[in-house]
Amino acid sequence: MLSPKRTKFRKQQRGRMRGVATRGNKIAFGQFALQAQDCGWVTSRQIEASRRAMTRYVKRGGQIWIRIFPDKPVTMRPAETRMGSGKGNPEFWVAVVKPGRILFEMGGDEITETIAKEAMRLAQYKLPVKTKFISLDEDLNKGNYKPAKTPVTADDSESSS
């Protein structure tokens, strides 16, 4: 299961989930991705269950990238304890997910869109947030990606003047 090796502080406040994801909202590694539509907490167990479901379906065909990491500790108090006497102990780790965040990516030579869609569908069932399947082609058509500027070489600058 995923969890940080060490943290500066053992316990965190719960916080609020407002707005949309401004980082991690574009496909970076593969050709297909699973994008969050809602906000929520995804636990390390849910991430692992989704990863296993996708890996079992794809077998050795392609590669899977996990784009979220559970870095927030969630504390709980023991059952039937009275109020007060401090905050509970960290029980599990969650990743805070906002709408637009890419959760998983998939790619490879042997991965077709139908295989990727089915693998992502199996992963969707394991997650507590509403998600949608997107491909790199759709993202390019939306204008989310700008082509990289070609570097100007010494030969180009001489011919232009």
UniProtKB/Swiss-Prot annotation:
Region (Disordered): 140-161
Organism field: Prochlorococcus marinus (strain NATL1A)
InterPro entries per UniProt: Ribosomal_uL16 (IPR047873), Ribosomal_uL16_bact-type (IPR000114), Ribosomal_uL16_CS (IPR020798), Ribosomal_uL16_dom (IPR016180), Ribosomal_uL16_sf (IPR036920)
Gene Ontology molecular function, alphabetical: rRNA binding; structural constituent of ribosome; tRNA binding
Family of the protein in this entry: Belongs to the universal ribosomal protein uL16 family.
GO BP term (any one): translation
Gene Ontology terms: cellular component: ribonucleoprotein complex; ribosome
Pfam families to which the protein is assigned, alphabetical: Ribosomal_L16
Entries under CDD domains matching the protein: Ribosomal_L16_L10e
HAMAP family, alphabetized: Ribosomal_uL16 (MF_01342)
Keyword Ribonucleoprotein assigned: yes
Organismal lineage: Bacteria, Bacillati, Cyanobacteriota, Cyanophyceae, Synechococcales
Keywords: Ribonucleoprotein, Ribosomal protein, RNA-binding, rRNA-binding, tRNA-binding
Subunit structure: Part of the 50S ribosomal subunit.
Functional summary from the UniProt entry: Binds 23S rRNA and is also seen to make contacts with the A and possibly P site tRNAs.
Gene transcribed to yield this protein: rplP
Protein known as: Large ribosomal subunit protein uL16
Transmembrane segments: none
